[in-house]
Regions:
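Residue-level micro-sites within transmembrane alpha helices that shape
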Residues: 7-8, 46, 278
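Bacterial N-terminal signal peptides
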Residues: 9-22
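Bacterial N-terminal signal peptides that target proteins for export
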Residues: 1-11
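Alpha-helical structural motif
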Residues: 11-12, 47, 191
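Glycine-rich phosphate- or other oxyanion-binding loops that anchor nucleotides, phosphorylated ligands
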Residues: 28-38, 62-313
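Boundary at the C-terminal end of the N-terminal hydrophobic targeting segment
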Residues: 24-26
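N-terminal targeting signals for Sec/Tat export/insertion, comprising classic cleavable signal peptides
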Residues: 36-64
């Protein structure tokens, strides 16, 4: 009997170990499901609230602490999640969704700081290209106010902001296994064409809700095309805002999209990003406006995304 019990305990222990190893393996690389989906992401929760509230057949999956919601949005199979704020989170979790779900297209929705002086708070931009403005050389000061790149560094082509000289980033992809240097990552032409078909969409001028009192001074508009830039900084500086507009011809500046776009490029997955202006990145007359206009901006971005999915074929 004692021998039988020992053997039984050994078998149970081996079974438990096998299950544990199997679970660990599954968590290391399995696909959650095989349904082709559009991945929809935002940086933090309030940006995703409206979209989650309209998702049908919603089912949650937690991977590496990130909650993914599968379901249908405007009749399209989707997986929605929060990337987290800033570049590393955006890159890491964009790759995670590509690894664990059958993602056919990537869509980012959220807020941004306005850089183009021709745009207003509440406007929604859909840039054609995104670049990383903080991929930089911090050059030595060779004389007062003058910062000189080393002679061997031949990829410093853009104007500098003080000691900061923007540079392209090295990237590999399935189509270019040898590292290439790129500054701009281009949104998918077919997705941009779909966005152009909803360009006359009426956006909200006032915050929704019975207690809402916040309204914009100008009717917001949807702007397709142009450029956006991203980096690991919350920008609230008029001088840098002016530099970003003149140097990159940027409409908006944020903290995630260029990293997301780079991962999309590396994986050869089409992408588009909708960014609504919540503030002017330091260009306003008073304190930064994000606290006042965040909700209008986030809801307008989500409204455009919903219209885009309705139009998407």
């Amino acid at each position: 009997m004692k021998l039988y019990l020992c053997a039984r305990h050994l078998i149970l222990a081996l079974l438990a170990y096998t299950l544990l190893v199997g679970t660990t393996w599954a968590n290391d690389g399995f696909k959650v499901d095989s349904t082709p989906r559009v991945a929809v992401l935002s940086a933090f929760e309030p940006e995703l609230t409206l979209l989650l509230s309209q998702t049908q057949q919603a089912k949650k999956h937690r991977i590496n602490g990130v909650d993914f919601t599968t379901g249908k949005l405007q009749g399209k199979p989707v997986v929605l999640f929060l990337s987290g704020i800033s570049m590393t989170n955006a890159a890491m979790n964009t790759q995670l969704v590509l690894d664990r779900f059958n993602v056919t297209h990537l869509v980012f929705s959220g807020i941004a700081g306005g850089v183009n002086p021709g745009l207003n708070i509440g406007d929604v931009t859909v840039p054609e290209q995104w670049g990383q403005y903080l991929e930089v050389l911090m050059a030595r000061e060779t004389e007062p106010g003058k910062y000189q790149p080393p002679g061997w560094m031949d990829d410093v082509k853009l104007p500098n902001f003080g000691m900061m000289h923007p540079r392209p980033v090295g990237v590999r992809s399935a189509n270019a296994p040898k590292e290439e240097k790129k500054f701009w990552f281009t949104a998918d032409p077919a997705m941009l064409a779909t966005a152009q078909r909803i360009e006359r969409l009426t956006l909200d001028k006032c915050e929704k809700g019975d207690a809402a009192k916040v309204c914009l001074t100008a009717q917001p508009k949807l702007v397709i095309g142009g450029k956006g830039v991203s980096g690991q900084a919350f920008v609230d500086n008029a001088a840098f805002r002016d530099y970003a507009f003149k140097t990159f011809e940027a409409n908006v500046l944020d903290m995630e999209t260029a990293a997301f776009a780079m991962v999309a490029y590396s994986n050869s997955v089409p992408y588009i990003a909708f960014r609504s202006l919540s503030d002017l990145a330091g260009g306003g007359k008073g304190e930064n406006e994000i606290g006042t206009f965040f909700k209008i901006a986030a809801d307008n971005s989500a409204k455009v995304l919903l219209a885009f999915l309705t139009e998407w074929r």
